[in-house]
Amino acid sequence: MKQGIHPNYVEVTATCSCGNVIKTRSTVGKDLNLDVCGNCHPFYTGKQRVVDTGGRVERFNKRFSIPSTK
C-alpha cells in the first residue's frame, strides 16, 4: 500500500437532533450533526404514517378528463 495517499481515518461523534450520540470513525475529520437516526426515525420507531394520495389522483384525472383505470 502506498504511503501518504490515503485520508486520515479518525474517530468522530455524530449527534442527532433527538440528542442521541453515536461514536464512529470517518474520513470527514469533524463531528457530524444528524437530522434523524435509528432512535427517532418514524420507520424504526413504528410511528410511520401512510399518506393517502388517492383523492389527489382522482382530482387530477377528473380535471384532465382521463378515464379511470379501475
Curated annotation (Swiss-Prot):
Q: Name one GO biological process term.
A: translation
Keyword hit for Nucleotide-binding: no
Please indicate if the UniProt record lists Cytoplasm as a keyword: no
Which residues bind Zn(2+) per the record?
Answer: 16, 18, 37, 40
Q: Which Pfam families match?
A: Ribosomal_L31
Cofactor: how and how many bound: Binds 1 zinc ion per subunit.
Query: Required cofactors, per record?
Result: Zn(2+)
Instruction: List GO molecular-function terms, semicolon-separated.
Output: metal ion binding; rRNA binding; structural constituent of ribosome
- Give any Gene Ontology cellular component: ribonucleoprotein complex
> Keywords for this entry?
Metal-binding, Ribonucleoprotein, Ribosomal protein, RNA-binding, rRNA-binding, Zinc
Q: Which InterPro entries match?
A: Ribosomal_bL28/bL31-like_sf (IPR034704), Ribosomal_bL31 (IPR002150), Ribosomal_bL31_A (IPR027491), Ribosomal_bL31_sf (IPR042105)
Q: What HAMAP family does the database record attribute to this sequence?
A: Ribosomal_bL31_1
Q: What does this protein do?
A: Binds the 23S rRNA.
What quaternary structure, including any partners, is listed in this protein's UniProt entry? Part of the 50S ribosomal subunit.
Name the family: Belongs to the bacterial ribosomal protein bL31 family. Type A subfamily.
The protein's name in its UniProt record: Large ribosomal subunit protein bL31
